[in-house]
From Swiss-Prot:
The keyword 4Fe-4S does not apply. A divalent metal cation binds at D8, H10, H42. 4-CDP-2-C-methyl-D-erythritol 2-phosphate binds at D8, V9, H10, H34, S35, D56, I57, G58, T132, T133, N134, E135, R142. GO terms for biological process: isopentenyl diphosphate biosynthetic process, methylerythritol 4-phosphate pathway; terpenoid biosynthetic process. Binds 1 divalent metal cation per subunit. The keyword Lyase applies. CDD domains: MECDP_synthase (cd00554). Its EC number is 4.6.1.12. PROSITE patterns: ISPF. This is 2-C-methyl-D-erythritol 2,4-cyclodiphosphate synthase. Keywords: Isoprene biosynthesis, Lyase, Metal-binding. It catalyses: 4-CDP-2-C-methyl-D-erythritol 2-phosphate = 2-C-methyl-D-erythritol 2,4-cyclic diphosphate + CMP. It comes from the Bacteria.
Length: 157
């Protein structure tokens, strides 16, 4: 068994679609980034890559490459799964935490869990997604951006 941790942060930006955990959340500015800026899937991807000692998301999907411009992060997470499998690993568990003031995420969590499970070819019961606010503190509290933390366990195939 190996453990990984991933963290990602993105600022909000006008004119972008908000996508978290592969779920479109209407009525709110999106997150800014080279890809779709899915803060949750980026944190999960980094946790998995770290657990396998395979670097990070920036190494495999650099923000300098047009290939990944505005790409759906579910595609990236599926690529991470394939990379893990190539190196003899599979996902055992994902536990993730979103940090943002608005919008409220509770109605979307089941969809996020399903998307992560589908990308990683695991059961939904192996994926936990939670959300909390920053109690109005810092850039998250001022609603300037969002962050996600993820911890994973992987094992040899």
């Amino acid at each position: 068994m190996r453990i990984g941790i991933g963290i990602d942060v993105h600022p909000f930006a006008e004119g972008r679609k908000l996508v978290i955990g592969g779920v479109h959340i209407p009525g709110h500015n999106g997150l800014d980034g080279h890809s779709d800026a899915d803060v949750l899937l980026h944190a999960v991807s980094d946790a998995l890559l770290g657990a396998a000692a395979l670097g990070d998301i920036g190494l495999h999907f650099p923000n300098t490459s047009q290939e990944f411009k505005d790409i759906d992060s579910m595609i990236l997470l599926k690529q991470v799964r394939k990379l893990l499998e190539k190196h003899g690993y599979q996902t055992v568990n994902i536990d993730a935490m979103l940090l943002l003031e608005e919008p409220k995420i509770a109605p979307y969590i089941t969809g996020m869990r399903k998307n992560i499970a589908r990308c990683l070819d695991i059961e939904i019961g192996m994926v936990s997604v939670k959300a909390t606010t920053n109690e109005k503190l810092g850039y998250i509290g001022r609603e300037e951006g969002a962050a996600a933390h993820a911890v994973c366990i992987i094992r040899s195939l």
